[in-house]
């Protein structure tokens, strides 16, 4: 098969090219630079900065300082948007699981992503932080035009975010529709609950 994005065939493109096209992903287990601060983690994302070359490091220090100031300002705006500005100077390794998920979401904001794949964003996250993450995702979608593809098992989280919903099992699509339609689908019930449990529920 082929994968297209805005009409362009992106099948087989390497990760760095997908990144530059605005296609990003987060991971079920968050990956961060443990010993760096939350703000520094965000400032690392854009890449291709002037300070990366020895020539600029010696002869264009003013440009480097200006770029760093701009990145710092943008990182602080992202942290404010995500309601974790108070953690800017905290070591990323000290964050909770949910806070690390917010940090990963913040990374996508540093490069103005177009499409973001979220892999099991609710895994290991308490309910309060999960709803904070959901609110941030909704705002990014509605206010900034981000598109999210959410891979998730938490039905409350899906209900808050997703329309339509696609249910898959063993690599194939079982059903597509609203969450209510998915929950009522016979194939979905059988695949995830089993025929025995389905029949038991019907008798009860």
Predicted features and spans:
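Conserved ABC ATPase signature
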Residues: 91-95
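Conserved ABC ATPase "signature" region
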Residues: 52-87, 114, 135-138
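Helical segment within the ABC ATPase nucleotide-binding domain
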Residues: 131-143
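Conserved ABC transporter NBD signature motif
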Residues: 1-8, 20-21
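Catalytic Walker B motif of ABC-type/P-loop ATPase nucleotide-binding domains
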Residues: 116-119
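A short, surface-exposed alpha-helical micro-motif characterized by mixed small hydrophobic
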Residues: 158-160
């Amino acid at each position: 098969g082929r994968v297209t994005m805005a009409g362009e065939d992106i099948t087989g493109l390497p990760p760095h090219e997908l990144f530059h096209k605005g296609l990003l992903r987060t991971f079920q287990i968050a990956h961060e630079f443990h010993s760096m601060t939350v703000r520094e983690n965000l400032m690392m994302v854009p890449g291709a900065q002037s300070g990366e070359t020895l020539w600029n490091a010696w002869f264009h220090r003013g440009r480097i300082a200006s770029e760093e100031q701009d990145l710092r300002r943008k990182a602080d705006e992202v942290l404010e948007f995500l309601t974790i500005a108070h953690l800017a100077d905290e070591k990323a390794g000290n964050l909770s699981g949910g806070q690390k998920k917010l940090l990963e979401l913040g990374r996508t904001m540093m490069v103005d992503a177009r499409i973001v794949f979220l892999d099991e964003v609710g895994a290991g996250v308490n309910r309060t932080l999960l709803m904070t993450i959901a609110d941030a995702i909704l705002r990014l979608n509605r206010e900034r035009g981000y598109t999210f593809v959410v891979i998730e098992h938490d039905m409350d989280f899906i209900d808050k975010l997703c329309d339509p919903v696609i249910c898959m099992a063993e690599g194939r699509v079982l059903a597509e529709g609203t969450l209510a339609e998915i929950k009522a689908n016979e194939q979905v019930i059988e695949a995830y609950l089993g025929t025995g449990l389905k029949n038991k529920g019907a008798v009860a």
